[in-house]
Amino acid sequence: MTDVARVMAGNPQVNKSLYRAIRFMVHDAAIVIDLPDGTRTLILREIEMDRAKKHARADHVFGYSDFTPSGGLSGDRDTAAAQSTAECLRRNGITTVIADRTLPLMYVHFIEAAGMRVNLDQDMGVLDRRVKDAEEL
């Protein structure tokens, strides 16, 4: 099995590529991780989990606190989201992350601090948005 995952993160209200990937709107940070086994993990604020399990395009839905690193999560929600992303990737044995061009620098910082490489895919999410699918027609 490969140890590469694809990651998109941010606010789906602003990040249209992220919204298109999960088709789920929230007001806080949402993280989608496509793991090497073909499953999609969505991490978001705990209050949104039940709704996301019903409506989001994801195989697994978790809250930020489900991936608390050994040093704990920051009290700042955006920082905690980035920390939980890195911890989820670490627990899944990921060594390399492919990210779209909108991945916030804070996520890159925590992912790299956890010992993983981050590579940019400039086209990730962009080409998908240029073609309408059946749900968008």
Model-derived segments and spans:
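Terminal domain-start leader segments
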Residues: 1-91
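Flexible, acidic/His-enriched mid-domain "rim/lid" segments that flank
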Residues: 77-137
